[in-house]
Each structure stands twice: as C-alpha cells, then as structure tokens.
Amino acid sequence: MADQLSEEQIVEFREAFSLFDKDGDGSITTKELGTVMRSLGQNPTEAELQDMISEVDADSNGNIEFKEFLGLMARKLRDKDSEEELKEAFRVFDKDQNGFISAAELRHVMANIGERLTDEEVGEMISEADVDGDGQINYEEFVKCMMAKKRRKRIEEKREHDGGSRTKSAGPSAAPASKRGQKCVIL
C-alpha cells in the first residue's frame, strides 16, 4: 500500500516521523502517532487512532515502525480520496436531494439493488447511523457510518490474515460490531 505514495510524500512523512523518533530506532510510540499525523495535516479521532493502532501494532509492544506508519498514511490518504465516492453514494440514496436519507429513500434504493427490507430492518439501519436521533441520515452521519464500516472491515481482514489471535483494544471500537453499525447501511 505504501507503494501508492510519491517519493515526495514519503520524504515528508519520514521527516515528520523522525521528529518524534527520539532515539532514532525507526519507531514511535502509539501515543505519539496522533501527534505525528496531526503534524501532517490529518486529524484522527481517538477511536480512529485506536483502530489504526490495532491494525499495525501486531506485537502489541506500543511501537509503530516507519514502514507501518507509511501504510497507515497511504490508507488515510486513500480514504480521503474516496470522499467523492461517498458524496456520490449519498446522492444516490438522497433521492429528493434534501440532504437527508429517509426510511422511504433507503427502502427504495435497497429494493433497487435486490434487498427487500422489512420496516423493522429499515428502522434498525436508520437508527444505527442516525447520531442526532432525527429519524434520518444526514451526510455527516452517512460518512461516519461508512468510514467506521471500512475501518472495521480492515481490522477484521487483518485479524483473519493474522489468524485471529488478537482481541480488540478497549474503547469505542471494542463494542460488538452488531452494536456499532454492523448493519451500517448501506453498501
């Protein structure tokens, strides 16, 4: 994945990484990860940082090597690139273009892709993503839902690849997926 980065990006990331690699051993602590990323213009939440650490700190030693960091940054930039895709997906669901996905719009789109849903299933899907409780999904809620789903999928893929021997760290992402948007909607 780091092979998707330009030489210029790698140099920039190395410089930022090196600032926090106090002893020059090629690794930073997981606690420093957020600071390094913010110095590069990223603004990860604590939950995102925990998910990222779960992805790369395979030996749970609290250190992240530069190669692992490059992989994280490449994924973060790729996620940023997919913002246009998310906007387009939201427009597909938001049939009346009012900035919200209603239960009726969700049911309509899901039916068009061959997913017949009961009223209860539609209600569950809406409530999973509906942070403000207004009964609809706005764009911000849609993006959070989709990005969280992507992160969970990457973590699950890594676990399967690693043999599933690790458990999730404590924090928001430690809740069972079924309680944290597993049905989160949509794609």
From Swiss-Prot:
Propeptide: 185-187
Highest taxon, organism lineage: Eukaryota
Subcellular localization, as worded in the UniProt entry: Membrane
Membrane topology: Lipid-anchor
Keyword field contains Ligase: no
Residues binding Ca(2+) 2, per UniProt: D57, D59, N61, N63, E68
Protein name: Calmodulin-like protein 1
Lineage per the UniProt record: Eukaryota, Viridiplantae, Streptophyta, Embryophyta, Tracheophyta
Gene: CML1
